[in-house]
A protein has these predicted regions:
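Residue-level recognition of single "structural anchor" positions
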Residues: 1-199
């Protein structure tokens, strides 16, 4: 589906921006509700990663936890769907419960070398890593290129917005997740999925 700005929608529909904002907010709330229902992953090959959204990187601060940014955790089933959520931080204590709640034991998980992923094997997963800090981005089938493709897509979308409050950020994030997951659907199917799927 097309991804118009509010100004473009206003020009097409002749509605004022306040009305458009109200309608879009209702749609995003519905999308967020549906996204939670779709977010359970079956067994398979899953890529997991984190990314940071928001303020520009502060000089002198590098890596995970860069000041002023919002941490987002993501899981992508290869040849399937993505799930993303805002997290307080990217520690093992925060990420492991999400992983265990979304991915069945016995699945194969691909990650980078972040220490929060230590212990996945002990929790019943097959775990393969690539070490970006050693300029390793793929080893055979082991890589996180799929989830990184989603991060690139999401950040291109967010570059259009001039700052978002925390509650609006989450809704836009789930909209981005939904658009990615249904990117091959035609518009009619997309609208039907949002508004006519039973709770």
């Amino acid at each position: 589906s097309e991804d118009f700005t509010i100004l473009q929608i206003a020009k097409i529909t002749k509605l004022n921006r306040k009305t458009i904002n109200f309608i879009l907010n209702k749609i995003r709330i519905r999308i967020s509700e549906l996204a939670e229902k779709e977010s359970y992953f079956t067994q398979g090959e899953i890529e997991i990663d984190e990314s940071y959204f928001g303020a520009r990187r502060v000089r002198g601060r590098r890596g995970r936890g860069a000041a002023g940014k919002t941490p987002v955790f993501g899981l992508l089933k290869r040849n399937g769907k993505v799930f993303v959520t805002v997290v307080p931080n990217c520690s093992r204590e925060e990420l492991m419960p999400i992983i265990q709640g979304k991915i069945l034991e016995g699945s194969t998980i691909h990650t980078d070398g972040w220490k929060a992923y230590d212990g996945l094997i002990l929790n019943g997963y097959n775990h393969y890593r690539v070490f970006h800090h050693e300029n390793e981005f793929a080893r055979g089938k082991s890589h996180v290129n799929g989830i990184e493709c989603f991060w690139s897509y999401a950040k291109r979308r967010f570059s259009k917005f001039n700052g978002l409050t925390d509650d609006k950020f989450i809704l836009h994030l789930k909209e981005t997740e939904c658009r990615f997951n249904h990117r091959s659907d035609d518009f009619a199917s997309f609208i039907e999925h949002i508004f006519f799927i039973k709770n």
